[in-house]
Amino acid sequence: KVIPMPLNVVGTTATEEDFELSEMVSFVELFNTTVEKVQEVLPKLTASMQSLCPTFYSAIQEDVDGMLLKSCTISKLTPGTKINPHSGDIDSLRLHFPVIEDEGAWLSVRGRKRSWKVGELFAFHDHDKHWAQHNGTHDRIVVIMDYALSQLEDRGITIEKWEEELAI
């Protein structure tokens, strides 16, 4: 199956009316599974973020008003899925926190292809052309967080600084 644009299981605007009952049941199962997995890998993700991008980590720790985080979604990519190349439209720094990986699933950003690894943070500017494909055998689940670039820049964090810290 080919998905022309990113398809996330749930977005910040999803309501119960957006889903059939069977979809809600599978969403609840996915949500519960994801929460359990996030709790398992959170210490590793936190350590990864602290060591790889200390400036950003410090900024989100101080973000008590929640102004930096624009959206948070759970993305499930099933085997055989391809998301066509596209560019985001919300001008954000997009972070991927993998909670269930499959070596056959990958994401390409600016022509650089990489797989998701549980416990390893991956981030990019959502305006960069990106696409994904899943040739593996089981679902890949990622928590995706979008952070407001303008708010980050007000705190001295630019895309260039982020890429420098992550050696992108």
Question: Can you name each region flagged by the protein language model?
Answer:
Residues 46, 161-163:
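Intrinsically disordered, low-complexity polar regions and short flexible loop motifs
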Residues 132-135:
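Asparagine-centered strand-capping/turn motif at beta-strand->loop junctions
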Residues 1-64:
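Non-heme Fe(II)/2-oxoglutarate
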Residues 93-98, 121-123, 137-155:
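A short hydrophobic beta-strand segment most commonly corresponding to one strand
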Residues 98-118:
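A short beta-strand-loop-beta hairpin characteristic of the jelly-roll/cupin
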Residues 59-79:
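A short glycine-rich, His/Asp/Glu-containing loop-to-beta-strand
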Residues 115-129:
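Conserved metal-binding segment of the jelly-roll/cupin
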Residues 76-78, 88-104:
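Short, conserved beta-strand element in jelly-roll/cupin
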